[in-house]
């Protein structure tokens, strides 16, 4: 099968602080952020609910880095697909150190999910939608339609099929994350790196 192995990391968590975006000499963007994932369990002896939070360093490159810097804020819930990499660096005292990071490059994914956006639970989650991408905007219904009815209404208003070619415009998917088969729906704000 995979004689060389597989290096794939999938994380769903909350951003710990606003992403830091900088630019390399060649003009390519790099975004750094920390992502918190938590697990909870009940202690068998005490019956207490316990929680453990793990912090992950995430580095995004290129267009994904630019979009992350623009739309992702502290508290945002995001889905990340990338690869685990360890790099060596030297601190100011001349001591060699190692850092392990999740790197999201070409072929990686960053998807904005529902939940907290910049610490404001009432803020609308349109940050990763098609705004600013040159695609026509559909009016957002303000009635009590179900998401399926809203999707059907939107798809009837689209006259042109979307292709999968080498386009700079995003493809408007409304897919759930495959492992979320327990009724969880994560929205449609997906950004893929395509070169």
From Swiss-Prot:
GO biological process: DNA replication
One Gene Ontology molecular-function label: single-stranded DNA binding
Known DNA-binding region: 55-61
Gene3D superfamilies: Nucleic acid-binding proteins (2.40.50.140)
Entries under InterPro entries matching the protein: NA-bd_OB-fold, Primosome_PriB/ssb, ssDNA-bd
Any one Gene Ontology cellular component term annotated for this protein: nucleoid
Biased composition (Low complexity): 119-163
Region Disordered, residue ranges: 111-176
The protein's name in its UniProt record: Single-stranded DNA-binding protein
Organism from which the protein derives: Proteus vulgaris
């Amino acid at each position: 099968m995979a004689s060389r192995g597989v290096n794939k990391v999938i994380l769903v968590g909350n951003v710990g602080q606003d992403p830091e975006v900088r630019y390399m000499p060649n003009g390519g963007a790099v975004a750094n952020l920390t992502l918190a994932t938590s697990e909870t369990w009940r202690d068998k002896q005490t019956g207490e609910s316990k929680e453990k939070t793990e912090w992950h360093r995430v580095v995004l490159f290129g267009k994904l880095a630019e979009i992350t810097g623009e739309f992702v804020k502290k508290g945002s819930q995001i889905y990340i697909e990338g690869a685990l990499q360890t790099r060596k660096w030297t601190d100011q005292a001349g001591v060699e150190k190692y850092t392990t990071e999740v790197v999201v490059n070409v072929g990686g994914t960053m998807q904005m999910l529902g939940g907290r956006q910049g610490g404001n639970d009432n803020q609308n989650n349109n940050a990763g939608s098609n705004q600013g991408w040159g695609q026509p905007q559909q009016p957002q219904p303000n009635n009590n339609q179900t998401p399926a009815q809203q999707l059907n209404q939107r798809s009837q208003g689209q006259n042109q099929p979307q292709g999968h070619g080498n386009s700079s415009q995003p493809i408007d998917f409304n897919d759930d994350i495959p492992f979320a088969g327990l009724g969880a729906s994560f929205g449609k704000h997906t950004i893929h790196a395509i070169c």
